[in-house]
Amino acid sequence: MKFSELGLSDSLLKAIKRSGYEEATPIQEQTIPMVLEGKDVIGQAQTGTGKTAAFGLPIIENVDTENPNIQAIIISPTRELAIQTQEELYRLGKDKHVRVQVVYGGADIRRQIKSLKQHPQILVGTPGRLRDHINRHTVKLDHIKTLVLDEADEMLNMGFLEDIESIIKETPDDRQTLLFSATMPPEIKRIGVQFMSDPETVRIKAKELTTDLVDQYYVRARDYEKFDIMTRLIDVQDPDLTIVFGRTKRRVDELSKGLIARGYNAAGIHGDLTQDKRSKIMWKFKNNELDILVATDVAARGLDISGVTHVYNYDIPSDPDSYVHRIGRTGRAGHHGVSLTFVTPNEMDYLHEIEKLTRVRMLPLKPPTAEEAFKGQVASAFNDIDELIAQDSTDRYEEAAEKLLETHNATDLVAALLNNMTKEAASEVPVKITPERPLPRRNKRNNRNGNRNNSHGGNHYRRKNFRRHQHGSHRNDNHGKSHSSRHSFNIRHRKEN
């Protein structure tokens, strides 16, 4: 359905077109008319489905720009999601001159107070910082028309339920309430009953919780094996942009440092980093100055970054819902993605729980060998050389090249170049990753699947467009492709219609 059929004004339709939206997504198509009518809505939708515009467009449409009071409040679980939401609403509401502000922890509260004096009509914030401003009387919610709880299940997981309830109680009883959540645990349903008035429900069917656009695999490995296997997979699959999920802050720090030590263009984010440092890392990742982002679940919540082709779950999540959130980082906007989950032998029951929720059976992958990883690096170097020759003018270097050829064998020269462009063998750069406490064993309700292991799997590797940080362009792959697979299903991105 086109946005022009949803009852939005011309100024908003222009903003929508400028933002690159073409047709409304299912969540937008169903939600926007309901919100415009003033109904309460519960939307079960994961990040990447367009839910920010689903609630943002009708909120902007309904804002009275002559009224200086806060008329809509959006509560987000993380700083990153709050910032992204504010930026998107600002872009969409710019033509209408709607003022949108964001408040979050880790930033100078005095600057936020100064910004709040500019009388925003839409306020986005994290629960703790919103509660702080309410206590300081720098935020007043008595004129709120619409309240949005975004990523409600994640706010619940982070322990924000009490803050959320106290914030809701500061708003008028006759407000409109919109609740969005990828999953619907009992506590979220209770919020709907307690604080919403005859809400309409927009629900994604369980089979759609993980999109068909994401090819889902697992590798069975012991904890001490995972890092070497992951780097080999990166060498062979050669992703464009990758997010690696670690269970703890220490894990994220060690993984990012280990990847950097092995020559990968990587950085890690978690809650202990300053907001300024997190913002700089995220800017680099969004602008293709980083190839690999390592993150905890909390730090990565709500990230809306286009072009992520691979998600590596270095640690399997203890909660199946977190898996849904993680792989929602890829397979967006009609593009295919790949998720790969590392599973230790005693974690197979967690894998079965994920499959039960998503109704998708993950395919096993056989870890690549060191030789296959080396061939992957060489193939990537071939691509880099092809691209350099095609794009750069080399005339000024021809004389120097001829002199080198007079004193050196051509094969030796090319071999030296390839040696410089590829990474050292893993054995030459040992990386120690501290073992994490293993997840407790679950009751073996899914024992019928307990014998799954990599002996049934094949090599599902993909060669595609790995951006070295010296230059971020795409290229076609014509060298060194590895296809050994016992499955007819291939990890390559399938042809898009």
Curated annotation (Swiss-Prot):
Top EC category: hydrolase
Keywords: ATP-binding, Cell membrane, Cytoplasm, Helicase, Hydrolase, Membrane, Nucleotide-binding, RNA-binding, Stress response
E.C. no: 3.6.4.13
PROSITE patterns: DEAD_ATP_HELICASE, HELICASE_ATP_BIND_1, HELICASE_CTER, Q_MOTIF
InterPro entries: DEAD/DEAH_box_helicase_dom (IPR011545), DEAD_box_RNA_helicases (IPR050547), DEAD_helicase_CshA (IPR030880), Helicase_ATP-bd (IPR014001), Helicase_C-like (IPR001650), P-loop_NTPase (IPR027417), RNA-helicase_DEAD-box_CS (IPR000629), RNA_helicase_DEAD_Q_motif (IPR014014)
Gene3D superfamilies in the record: P-loop containing nucleotide triphosphate hydrolases
Membrane disposition: Peripheral membrane protein
Residue ranges, compositional bias (Basic residues): 459-473, 481-497
Protein name: ATP-dependent RNA helicase CshA
Naturally occurring in which organism (per UniProt): Limosilactobacillus reuteri
Lineage: Bacteria, Bacillati, Bacillota, Bacilli, Lactobacillales
